[in-house]
Amino acid sequence: MTGLEEWFESPIGRYLIEQEQAYFDQNVGDVFGYHAVQLGVPGFDFLRTSRMQLKVRAGPDLALDFFNMPFDSGSIDLAVLPHLLEFSCSPHQILREIERVVRPEGRIILSGFNPFSLWGLRRLATQSVAEPWCGNFISLSRMKDWLALLGFEVSAGRLCCYAPPFDQEKWLNRFAFMEKAGDRWWPISGGVYFLVAIKRVKGLRLIRPNWGINAALAPPVSELNKPRCRKSK
């Protein structure tokens, strides 16, 4: 068990992991394809609601070098990254490798700690060497910039964990009202953010059937099949 996974057993960790699990459960089930991989926090199954045929969790299922993954280019339909990048010495390099293995129009879903929040303030104040406070929290705007540079388009996202990061459960319960109020009154100050991003490739356009106005204006099949005769002059 990693230090972060041990922290998830604490009251504040459980407060976070319940919301993370709910978000991943809701979003991975809507992604279609054949191959899904979870990179990070291997002690929790964030792919459990995915309907893909092959689901791999780095750690219990497969030991991975995140900088050189044993997947073919463009072979992954969904990559889930729970708190992977903020505990890496080279997060942008990992993102480059993920961009390589994800197929065009494939998706990544990631979570990260928000440095511009009460949780970020605690990290600065404590200067702890324990996870998660020792991590390099990456801002939401910087993460979006990195994704855009690699050709990913952010399609959805949200923040959560607006309550102060108390270690005691009684204090978390007293500030539970902030969770519902946060989305309305201070939506960018949640302690944790989620992003869903789609890999876009220049020049690639999905062809969809056109059942709109052109189909409505087309003549009936019976008219098309009728023999046509010329009038004699």
Outline where the language-model segments fall.
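Class I SAM-dependent methyltransferase SAM/SAH-binding core
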Residues: 22, 26-72
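Hydrophobic beta-strand segment of the Class I
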Residues: 76-80
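A short glycine-rich, Lys/Arg-flanked "PGG" loop and its adjoining helix->strand segment in the class I
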Residues: 92-107
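Conserved class I S-adenosyl-L-methionine
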Residues: 107-137
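Short alpha-helix
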Residues: 125, 134-157
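Conserved catalytic loop of SAM-dependent methyltransferase domains
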Residues: 154-179, 188-189
